[in-house]
Amino acid sequence: MSTSAPIDEQLTDGAEALSAEEVIARMVERFHPRLVLASSFQQEESVLIDLLLKVEPGARIFTLDTGVLFPETYATWRAMEERWGIEIEAASGISLEQQAAEFGDELWKREPDRCCALRKVTPLKETLSGVDAWIVGVRRDQAPTRAGTPKIGWDEKHGIWKAAPLADWSERDVWRHIHANDLPYNPLHDRGYASIGCTHCTVPATDRSGRWAGSDKLECGLHG
């Protein structure tokens, strides 16, 4: 794994003109089986899992199980596994008990960045250390911090390639695909949750402001 940005014109040339399906196909052709899709069981991943498995039924999919996901999120996890007949891997950090013992109770209130680092960033780093590329559900219109997301680019933070096939999709595009294909999705979206994370740090909202409400935090550290 290299942290310096390589030049790979065959991979990146014309990527912005590709459809989501074409981006996924290009990534699979180049990197499978050293390619993973990261799922947080939000609406984007319903679409991505559907598209990815049509290209490569044996694709590897994982999620960051923080131990404090919503019951509805765990139910969506099971529903997706049943729908596609797959097993979605769980990547986890230290236990909640160990975290409390080392850093005190309710770390998410006092130091949300550290909590995200322990429960998300560290297990993500460990998972990505064994692959050459990953696929994510980032869309440019989700937040100002994501406006410049390329469809295929070099992830300097993790030293691997990263694809965001839905980068230019709107929320309406996502839901159109879900309903047209009768895909399972997280029911919290029907209750006003536009973005879904851990139970302690997520409230209903029309955008990512529902994450870490009351603070200026918009990202958990996975994508920047």
Residue ranges: model-predicted function:
Residues 1-224:
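Nucleotide-activated chemistry modules centered on ATP-dependent adenylation/adenylyltransferase
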